[in-house]
């Protein structure tokens, strides 16, 4: 089965207090086990990952260095996204390669720095929803809004985070290179952090200050690759309605009519579960016999067998 995996933040940083490169590398080693399990089972796997915490951390480091010495330049947001794509891709490709070699599997694992075209008139630019960086208390968030002009929103009851524009992906610039590598048997890591958001200006591609949601980028890649399945891996075993309430209910399988109903009820948090569900819906509608599943990282293999996760069907 040809699968596109979308890896969430927990696949890169398990401990929110440990933001070090060493901590990320160790978490990637654990993530590589779940990825290698799928490859060992004979699945053709391509990988997309998020970058919310990392892009916020890199940006904060750059801003702090500039405050200490204004000779240290500030970098545009799209460039910061490119930094994160290389940083995370480097860790993922090496840990997946290492885990495969332990199992006697010799496959090339490669990261492609990916630009993703967005519409400059996308409404997402006027309504920031994508959380980045660390979690803050309400008081800390209010101070950041006042001092730095950030837009801060509560993130699924876990605290407050900065939110930035999150336009939808229109196309992938490097799609032909990705398709060629996948068809040649490479394990490709692409659209890292949703890809570097760019708009077309004649023959030129211009970066824009935004973070494309990795779930929508993964869906776009899955369509381009004509994948059989889109597997979005996150921190929870199943999608829930009435989340964090006494009557919380885990969903094993939902059809598109139910998806629309739950979205209308506001059951899924913007910037969190909502884009995952919407990306799955879009992929299921993209062709016949398309499989879309939201599951936990550790239960990825079980989710493909129907033993875990939430399956979205027509």
Swiss-Prot record:
Keyword Nucleotide-binding attached: yes
Q: Which SUPFAM superfamilies match?
A: Carbamate kinase-like
The UniProt subunit note reads as follows:
Homodimer.
Catalysis performed (reactions): hydrogencarbonate + NH4(+) + ATP = carbamoyl phosphate + ADP + H2O + H(+)
NCBIfam families xrefs = arcC, PRK12352.1
Name where it's found: Cytoplasm
Q: Which residues form a coiled coil?
A: none
Q: Which domain of life is it from?
A: Bacteria
Pathway(s) per entry: Metabolic intermediate metabolism; carbamoyl phosphate degradation; CO(2) and NH(3) from carbamoyl phosphate: step 1/1
Q: Note the InterPro entries from the entry.
A: AceGlu_kinase-like_sf, Asp/Glu/Uridylate_kinase, Carb_kinase
Q: What is this protein called?
A: Carbamate kinase
EC numbers on record: 2.7.2.2
Q: Please give the biological process terms from Gene Ontology that the record holds.
A: arginine deiminase pathway
What's in the GO CC field?
A: cytosol
Query: So what family is this one in?
Result: Belongs to the carbamate kinase family.
User: Which UniProt keywords are given for this protein, alphabetically ordered?
Assistant: Arginine metabolism, ATP-binding, Cytoplasm, Kinase, Nucleotide-binding, Transferase
**Keyword Cytoplasm recorded:** yes
GO MF annotations, alphabetized: ATP binding; carbamate kinase activity
